[in-house]
Amino acid sequence: MKNKIKIRLKSFDHRSLDQATKEIVSAVKRTFANINGPIPLPRKIGRFTVNRSPHVHKKSREQFEIRKHKRLLVIGDPNPAVVDALSKVDLAAGVDVVIELESGE
């Protein structure tokens, strides 16, 4: 039976995302577990166009964009020490973490 832990990290700021990824990787490597990643996933770019003026001047517009950066970490055959190390990692406030446990036969 082969278990895996998949960790998906999302953030609007790539610097805080890379810092969080380094912290998780170093915590897992201290437990001597097998880790694959960080795998950079495609970023999503949302673009918004709004009028600058509230009334007239339709041709005068402003464009904004928001970028969502993502990384994937896969821990193969984790042990209880890995789970304990992951629970003790303190990450930045702007990083969203999704942890999935996948068990295979």
Swiss-Prot record:
One of its GO terms (molecular function) is tRNA binding. Pfam families: Ribosomal_S10. This is Small ribosomal subunit protein uS10. InterPro entries: Ribosomal_uS10, Ribosomal_uS10_dom, Ribosomal_uS10_dom_sf. Part of the 30S ribosomal subunit. It comes from Rickettsia massiliae (strain Mtu5). GO terms for biological process: translation. Keywords: Ribonucleoprotein, Ribosomal protein. Gene3D superfamilies: Ribosomal protein S10 domain. It comes from the Bacteria. Belongs to the universal ribosomal protein uS10 family. The gene is rpsJ. GO terms for cellular component: ribonucleoprotein complex; ribosome. Involved in the binding of tRNA to the ribosomes.
